[in-house]
């Protein structure tokens, strides 16, 4: 039988090797049906129709090739798969370095847990205390222990967080987020005076002050209100519930939403506001 007759009845999503297999099987079924019709002429004439041949082909072969049942690989749409061994950060555009435990061991062996004993803090002056908070690698001084701890991470060759676009490493999620936005083009902070937008809020504030003469209500180094940013499209909102509703509806398969749902299952007693502190 001509393939132009039966191919539309089966479907167009077939590979060339599948067509040759089907052609051979239909040819065999055609010969079988002719021999049966000669032995039993009382059967209806429509039994030799094209539809009957296709039905016989499907009935006689209980296990057709897998490529027939499944669509062509070119037509298949891959579903999002997240490796459980990899922990995503920054909305899925960064991952935690699997070698992060080695980084922690490096810091504990390279940095003393306490550079100054409590007794010496009482007797020593403020200048002596500030001198003690000095990076032993580059000599930079800090006023707070947490600032020294944060600075010392930049000297490590192993980075805690890796960019999923280029593999560049960072030890701070803020630096990772600022970097990945150069790949995605997300500029969530938009100027209301003009059409410019920026990847960081500090850049927007600097633009408003220098270009438009807008003074800010925040003091120097005063903490700003939290803004939740969708790293997929740049949508922003100050309320986590609204932000969560956005990624649930617009980006239901994003790594950010999948990470939140996983944390919600593990911490069912926690409220969404509490989960927002550990999911982002």
Curated annotation (Swiss-Prot):
SMART domains per record = ZnF_C2H2
Q: Zinc finger regions (C2H2-type), where? A: 133-155, 161-183, 189-212, 228-251
Pfam families according to UniProt? zf-C2H2
GO molecular function list: DNA-binding transcription factor activity; DNA-binding transcription factor activity, RNA polymerase II-specific; RNA polymerase II cis-regulatory region sequence-specific DNA binding; zinc ion binding
- Give the domain of life: Eukaryota
Enumerate the Gene Ontology biological process terms.
Answer: animal organ morphogenesis; epidermal cell differentiation; hindgut morphogenesis; nematode male tail tip morphogenesis; regulation of DNA-templated transcription; regulation of transcription by RNA polymerase II; response to salt stress
Task: Write down any Gene Ontology CC term.
Answer: nucleus
Give compartment(s). Nucleus
Keyword set for this entry?
Answer: Metal-binding, Nucleus, Repeat, Zinc, Zinc-finger
Major place of residence = nucleus
What task does this protein carry out?
A: Transcription factor. Involved in development of the hindgut, the male tail, and the excretory duct cell. Involved in modulating function of excretory duct cells. Plays a role in left/right patterning of cell fates in the hindgut.
Give the note.
Answer: Differences in the regulation of lin-48 expression may explain, at least in part, differences in excretory duct morphology and function between C.elegans and the related species C.briggsae.
- Full protein name: Transcription factor ovo-like homolog lin-48
Which lineage? Answer: Eukaryota, Metazoa, Ecdysozoa, Nematoda, Chromadorea
């Amino acid at each position: 039988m001509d393939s132009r007759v039966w191919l539309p009845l089966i479907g167009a999503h077939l590979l060339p090797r599948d067509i040759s297999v089907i052609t051979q099987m239909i040819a065999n079924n055609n010969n079988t049906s002719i021999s049966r019709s000669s032995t039993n002429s009382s059967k209806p004439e429509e039994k030799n129709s094209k539809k009957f041949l296709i039905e016989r082909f499907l009935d006689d072969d209980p296990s057709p090739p897998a490529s027939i049942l499944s669509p062509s690989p070119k037509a298949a749409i891959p579903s999002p798969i997240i490796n459980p061994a990899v922990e995503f950060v920054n909305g899925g555009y960064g991952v935690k370095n699997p070698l992060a435990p080695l980084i922690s061991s490096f810091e504990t062996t390279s940095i003393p847990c306490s550079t100054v004993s409590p007794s010496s803090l009482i007797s020593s002056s403020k200048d002596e205390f500030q001198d003690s908070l000095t990076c032993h690698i580059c000599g930079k001084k800090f006023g707070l222990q947490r600032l020294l701890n944060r600075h010392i991470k930049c000297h490590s060759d192993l980075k805690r967080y890796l960019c999923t676009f280029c593999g560049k490493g960072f030890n701070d999620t803020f630096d990772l987020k600022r970097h990945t936005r150069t790949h995605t083009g997300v500029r969530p902070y938009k100027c209301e005076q003009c059409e410019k937008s920026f990847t960081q809020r500090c850049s927007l504030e600097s633009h408003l002050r220098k270009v438009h003469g807008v003074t800010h209500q925040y003091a120097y180094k005063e903490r700003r209100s939290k803004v939740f940013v969708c790293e997929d499209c740049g949508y922003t909102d100050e309320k986590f519930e609204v932000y969560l509703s956005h990624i649930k509806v617009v980006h239901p398969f994003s790594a950010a939403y999948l990470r939140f749902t996983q944390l919600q299952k593990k911490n069912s007693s926690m409220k969404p506001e509490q989960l927002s502190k550990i999911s982002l």
